Amino acid sequence: MPMIDADGCLLNVSVEGRDGGPTLMLSNSLGCTLQMWEPQMKALTQLFRVIRYDRRGHGKSGVPAGPYSMERFGRDVLTILDDLNIEKTHWCGLSMGGMVGQWLGANAPERLNKIILANTTSKGNCVNTIQNCNHGTDKVA
């Protein structure tokens, strides 16, 4: 798996599937790694060149000091696409990955073919969400 430098943060990226096929980029939910898509890979790689990545702060990617933003996450995706010489991709984002997809759709629509937004929202406060995850679910139990 290549490591791609996005403004000093190394991002863990996986590229699998059909060479020359249409590209599908998968973006996972908060707290998950690119491995969350493993059960779908056999089917998807028969049809697509599939790009998965660990968002900064996740998995094998770097963990630079925050705060992070949707713009930062979106620009990381554009860096990955540029580094892999991909002009356009289909996008599938789950939860937070869908939020990144919305940023891309609004700010770099020329880089996307189709967008799948799964179980997502149009806004959120990443810092508060991460802090809540760090404190656990005691408040909602």
Question: Where is each model-derived feature located?
Answer:
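Residue in the alpha/beta-hydrolase core beta-strand immediately N-terminal to the catalytic nucleophile
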Residues: D54, H90, N113-I116
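N-terminal cap/lid segment of alpha/beta-hydrolase-fold proteins
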Residues: M1-L10
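Catalytic nucleophile serine of serine hydrolases
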Residues: S61, S95, N119
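Conserved acidic catalytic loop of the alpha/beta-hydrolase fold
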Residues: R72-T89
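Flexible "cap/lid" loop of the alpha/beta hydrolase fold
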Residues: M99-N107, L112-A141
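Short beta-strand immediately N-terminal to the catalytic nucleophile in serine-hydrolase-like folds
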Residues: F73, W91-G93, A118
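Conserved alpha/beta-hydrolase "nucleophile elbow" surrounding the catalytic nucleophile
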Residues: N28-L30, T89, G93-G98
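Conserved HGGG/HGGXW glycine-rich cap/lid loop of the alpha/beta-hydrolase fold
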Residues: C9-G66
